[in-house]
UniProtKB/Swiss-Prot annotation:
Its EC number is 2.4.2.17. Pfam families: HisG (PF01634). It is found in: Cytoplasm. Catalyzes the condensation of ATP and 5-phosphoribose 1-diphosphate to form N'-(5'-phosphoribosyl)-ATP (PR-ATP). Has a crucial role in the pathway because the rate of histidine biosynthesis seems to be controlled primarily by regulation of HisG enzymatic activity. The gene is hisG. GO terms for molecular function: ATP binding; ATP phosphoribosyltransferase activity; magnesium ion binding. The keyword GTP-binding does not apply. The keyword Cell inner membrane does not apply. This is ATP phosphoribosyltransferase.
Length: 304
């Protein structure tokens, strides 16, 4: 289907995610936390939504932007780097991207970086002039080189980019880096950041106007609730009125304290949502400041 052809009307939402790879399991877990469940087809590429009319398509990550642009899928979970690469390539071909990042989903963080052989004495981007750079992200790299005013050759490779300098097919590389272990194993060192990336929920620029619109709104609301609470804990405790201000100062990353009905013991019953780590040391600080009966509870979902 071409980007200019209207997608047929349908009443089920369709989401594309990576079949295998580092984003596959976190993406499925996030969607499951939003209340979705599926029945998998025999070919294991299509998952029929059982709890809601929301189906999954399991594909290669580099297929996801095109599936959204062509109206085959409504949403996809994919790396921002892949989204930007294909958007840039489409612009260079005179085509609209037709999709955008709706929101980050809190996993898959990495960096697209230039890496050079360890023996290089790196002095800055001017050193790239006339060099050959191997990458799986030629459009992003070409855009970056243009912004830097550097004339260098882009060598496109679909995989094993890190061995290109050793094979003599490139002088340096531009590749995704998370821990840096792969670079070190190939006697390379990162020297220049091209872009920061993370997994995002991507969607079509033109949102569906049929029955899928309500499903989309509901799913996004649920996802917001899950993402907001992912690293949050509900903290409950009792305290005397005179200690409340000191306790509040120890909770800078928490929501405003909420007072619960009195339990007849004289102390205030309080609760708050903490959006940072609630460690033993932190609980002990709160106890020394006058908090009593401290409880830390996990919250799985919320509708704000």
């Amino acid at each position: 289907m071409s980007a200019s052809t209207a997608a047929p009307a349908r009443d089920r939402l369709r989401i594309a995610i990576q079949k295998n790879g580092r984003l596959a399991e976190p993406a499925r877990s996030l969607l499951a936390a939003c209340g979705l469940s599926w029945r998998q087809s025999r070919d294991k590429l299509f998952c029929y939504g059982e709890s809601l009319p929301v189906d999954l398509l399991l594909v290669r990550d580099d297929d996801i932007p095109g599936l959204i642009a062509d109206g085959v899928c409504d949403l996809g979970i994919v790396g921002q780097n892949e989204l930007d690469e294909q958007a840039s390539a489409r612009r260079r071909a005179g085509l609209p991207a037709a999709y955008h990042a709706v929101r980050g989903v809190g996993f898959g963080q990495c960096r697209l970086m230039l890496a050079v052989p360890e023996e290089w004495g790196w002095q800055g981007v001017a050193q790239l002039a006339g060099k050959r750079i191997a990458t799986s992200y030629p459009a992003i790299l070409a855009d970056w080189l243009e912004r830097q005013g550097i004339d260098a050759s882009v060598v496109e490779l679909s995989g094993s980019v890190e061995i290109a300098p050793r094979l003599g097919t490139a002088d340096l590389i531009c590749d995704l880096v998370s821990s840096g272990a792969t670079l070190a194993a190939n006697q390379l060192k990162p020297v220049e950041l091209v872009m920061e990336s993370e997994a995002v929920l991507a969607g079509a620029v033109r949102e569906p106007a049929d029955a899928r619109a309500a499903l989309l709104a509901m799913l996004l609301r649920r996802m917001d609730g899950v993402l907001k609470l992912r690293d949050s804990k509900l903290l409950m405790f009792r305290a005397e009125q005179g200690n409340v201000d000191a306790l509040r100062r120890l909770l800078p990353d928490a929501d405003p304290l909420v007072q619960l009905p009195d339990d007849g013991n004289g102390a205030l019953r309080l609760q708050t949502m903490c959006h940072g780590a609630v460690t033993w040391q932190r609980l002990e600080e709160l106890e020394r400041a006058g908090a009593q009966g401290l409880m830390v509870l996990t919250v799985e979902r919320s509708l704000a």
